[in-house]
């Protein structure tokens, strides 16, 4: 399983240009992309589809479809199996995890043979532990059970003012902090590539890792 975890950034300007250029090397012409939108409210689906379609327009003849939350679990599983790429969008990671578990999708996602991409909350949900650091939407930092697609945790939209939250959490798990415009790539559970600045937190230590061979 190959996974791309994007920290955040604007799909419609050049902020994610390097990330999508890297993805374009991995995605074959006429690939079928399925958007997993459960982290956000359905009133935002249209704007998400427009921005993601623009971002993928640099790739040749890819098709983009959105997985409707009203489908049954069986219908969702069929749709997932018919696609080459799963793209999990941003919003609230706890909502995303809840719907996936409620619909019984975790096993089929873990066994998916194509490329899985997480953006913001989508990336957060992929970890064994999903860390949600405090901000305007969350008054306190919380840790919930993630989907376990990777054995590390991530911080998205990373800025160094959250280091004080991440250091104590790094005693129990490895955390990769991914700023807007950056991404990490994982294959078979191991990181092998970073795009732009990436930081690791472990045992109360912080390192920049994009300059190293992952």
Which residues fall in each region the model found?
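C-terminal and late-domain segments of enzyme folds
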Residues: 1-29, 39-50, 54, 132, ...
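A general structural motif
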Residues: 28-33, 61, 83, 113
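A residue-level signal for conserved active-site and pocket-lining positions in enzyme catalytic cores
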Residues: 33, 86, 120, 154, ...
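A structural signal for short, well-ordered beta-strand segments and their strand-loop junctions
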Residues: 35, 117-119, 177-178
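Class I S-adenosyl-L-methionine
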Residues: 42-76
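Short, well-ordered secondary-structure micro-motifs
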Residues: 46, 77, 99, 128-129, ...
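Flexible gly/pro-rich beta->alpha loop and the following alpha-helix that scaffold active-site loops
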Residues: 65-116
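Class I SAM-dependent methyltransferase SAM-binding "motif I" and its flanking Rossmann-like core
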Residues: 95-160
């Amino acid at each position: 399983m190959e996974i791309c975890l994007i920290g955040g950034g604007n799909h419609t300007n050049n902020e994610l240009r390097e990330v999508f250029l890297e993805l374009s090397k991995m995605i074959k012409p006429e690939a079928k992309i399925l958007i997993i939108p459960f982290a956000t409210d359905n009133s935002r689906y249209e704007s998400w589809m427009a921005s993601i379609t623009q971002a993928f327009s640099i790739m040749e003849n890819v098709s983009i479809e959105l997985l409707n939350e009203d489908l049954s679990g069986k219908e969702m599983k069929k749709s997932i199996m018919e696609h080459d790429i799963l793209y999990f969008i941003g919003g609230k990671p706890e909502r995303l995890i809840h719907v996936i578990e409620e619909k019984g999708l975790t096993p089929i996602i873990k066994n998916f043979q194509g490329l899985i991409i997480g953006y913001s909350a989508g990336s957060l949900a992929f970890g064994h532990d999903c860390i949600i650091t405090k901000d305007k939407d969350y008054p306190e930092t919380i840790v919930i059970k993630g989907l376990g697609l990777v054995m590390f945790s991530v911080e998205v939209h990373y800025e160094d003012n959250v280091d004080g939250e991440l250091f104590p959490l790094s005693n129990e798990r490895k955390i990769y902090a991914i700023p807007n415009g950056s991404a990490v790539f994982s294959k078979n559970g191991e990181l092998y590539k970073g795009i732009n600045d990436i930081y690791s937190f472990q045992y109360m230590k912080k390192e920049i890792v994009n300059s190293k061979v992952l």
